[in-house]
């Protein structure tokens, strides 16, 4: 609540009537902010007497002890991003799959997981079939893709921020990657992103909770496409999203939007274009 009071104009959420308090769900969400995306969902659930979720986080966030402690306090579990060997990574992912299955089906607890590895720094909310493949690992020989995910009760989540405190950093990262062919993260970069995301001004934040998805096709790609479609359809576009699209389409000038003109002052043309696209890509 303090984060909302200090750094948001408002926080709105819709779709809790799609959930039953005594059921567990697999919430699959678009991903814009490392810690706040699941935190906003947890806040909406908690305020309405639903149980909070177990949160999937990448192992890259565990390098610093305070971040690891914060994540564990938050009912988080680790998804390995690296390992010594392929076999070791496979074993770890199998353990994650087992954990997710047991939480949902035995403990009746819900799970939050992002639709792709890492935040959508380009504003393209596309579900990675590899995420679904990992979740299905433990039962892949017993249950078909569609039957499995129907059992998991998948709920699409869309979160949108009027202002993303990390928008320029994301744009600069994409720019450097394009320019140099690679991007080397500094040691504390993810932690600085977490801090900036929490303390930076976000304006209006909207969280939309969709209806349970009914899967009919037995392929990870088709299931991923369906999740992407649902997340995209219920995404709330703020004035920043709409203005970014209008600037790209030459309907208005950059100077017509105070936020973009201030934020992008003295930035190279390529960075301006990348950051505008980050906001505009959600506008269909």
Tell what function each PLM region has.
Residues 54-65, 69-82, 86-90:
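Conserved nucleotide-cofactor-binding alpha/beta core module
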Residues 115:
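Active-site-proximal binding-pocket segments
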Residues 1-25, 31-54, 59-65, 94-111, ...:
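Membrane-interfacial terminal anchoring regions of lipid-handling membrane enzymes
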């Amino acid at each position: 609540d303090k984060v909302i009071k200090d750094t948001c104009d408002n926080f709105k959420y819709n779709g809790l009537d799609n959930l039953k308090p005594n059921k567990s769900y697999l919430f699959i969400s678009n991903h814009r902010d490392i810690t706040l995306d699941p935190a906003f969902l947890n806040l909406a659930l908690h305020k309405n007497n639903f149980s909070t979720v177990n949160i999937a986080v990448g192992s890259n966030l565990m390098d610093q002890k305070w971040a690891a402690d914060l994540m564990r306090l938050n009912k988080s579990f680790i998804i390995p991003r690296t390992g010594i060997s392929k076999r070791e990574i496979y074993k770890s992912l199998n353990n994650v799959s087992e954990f997710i299955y047991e939480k949902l089906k035995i403990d009746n607890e819900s799970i939050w997981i992002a639709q792709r590895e890492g935040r959508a720094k380009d504003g393209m909310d596309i579900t990675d079939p590899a995420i679904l493949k990992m979740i299905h690992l433990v039962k892949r020989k017993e249950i078909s893709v569609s039957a499995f995910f129907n059992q998991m009760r998948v709920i699409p989540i869309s979160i949108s921020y009027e202002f993303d405190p990390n928008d320029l950093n994301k744009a600069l990262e994409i720019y450097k990657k394009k320019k140099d062919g690679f991007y080397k993260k500094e040691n504390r970069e993810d932690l600085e992103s977490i801090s900036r995301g929490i303390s930076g001004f976000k304006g209006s934040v909207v969280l939309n909770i969709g209806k349970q998805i009914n899967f009919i096709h037995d392929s990870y790609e088709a299931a991923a496409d369906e999740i992407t479609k649902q997340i995209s359809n219920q995404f709330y576009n703020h004035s920043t999203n709409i203005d970014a699209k209008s600037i790209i389409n030459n309907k208005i000038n950059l100077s017509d939007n105070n936020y973009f003109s201030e934020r992008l002052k003295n930035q190279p043309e390529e960075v301006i274009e990348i950051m505008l696209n980050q906001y505009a890509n959600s506008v269909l």
